[in-house]
Design a protein with these regions (language model features):
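Residue-level detection of the helix-turn-helix DNA-binding "recognition helix"
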Residues: 22, 36-37, 47
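Key DNA-contact positions within bacterial/archaeal DNA-binding proteins
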Residues: 29
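Short, amphipathic alpha-helix enriched in basic
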Residues: 1-23
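Residue-level preference for short helical/loop micro-motifs built around acidic side chains
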Residues: 19, 39-40, 69
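Hydrophobic/aromatic-rich alpha-helical bundle segments in the mid-to-C-terminal region
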Residues: 89-92, 97-100, 104, 119-164, ...
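HTH DNA-binding helix-turn interface
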Residues: 8-14, 32-42
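Hydrophobic alpha-helical connector segments
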Residues: 44, 51, 55-83, 94-98
Length: 173
């Protein structure tokens, strides 16, 4: 049910609950039995997005290869998730303190790989790892928002974000 609603909202982020139910092939009553309001649906989507992001980061094998290769894999995985959960980005998230703490925990492995890259001389050491991860996440959000207008797919979003990120974080000659 949540998967179907998420997919429907990815295609049409501003859809009403009735439109989400119809697009997902569900009866409106079925959707409302599980999520009585759009806010409840979005809260469930936020929780699911965090779980999926943690899984994607783990699956990115951050410790394999160079730190930049690990970051590249993470950006690719997170770009795909961003497109999938586009409605959360387009609508803006209701970011309470609990969500922000959970998001920080999910993103912590990325800060660790940035530190490893700094120690290896592959990432500028004058940039706080937290800032590099914030910049990466912000670019992903911006790229996913723009993808609806530009037609950029997951791969293009990942390429643009990673290219922009690495040109800013790698050591200057």
């Amino acid at each position: 049910l949540l998967e179907a609603a998420t997919a429907a909202l990815a295609r049409s982020p501003g859809a009403s609950m009735a439109q989400v139910a119809q697009a997902a092939g569900l009866a409106r009553a079925t959707l409302y039995r599980h999520f009585s309001t759009r806010q409840e649906l979005f809260a469930a989507m936020r929780a699911e997005a965090l779980v999926r992001a943690a899984e994607a980061i783990t699956a990115s094998r951050l410790d394999e290869g160079t730190p930049l290769e690990g970051l590249r894999r993470a950006v690719e995985a997170l770009a795909s998730l961003g497109v999938r959960f586009r409605a959360l980005i387009v609508e803006g998230a209701d970011l309470d303190a609990t969500f922000l703490q959970q998001r920080a925990e999910v993103l912590a492995p990325l800060q660790a790989v940035v530190r490893r890259g700094q120690e290896a001389g592959l990432i500028r050491s004058d940039l706080p790892p937290e800032w590099v991860v914030i910049a990466m996440a912000s670019m992903l959000v911006a790229a996913v928002r723009a993808s609806a207008d530009t037609g950029f797919g997951d791969g293009q979003v990942a390429d643009l974000v990673f290219g922009t990120l690495t040109s800013g974080i790698t050591p200057r000659p």
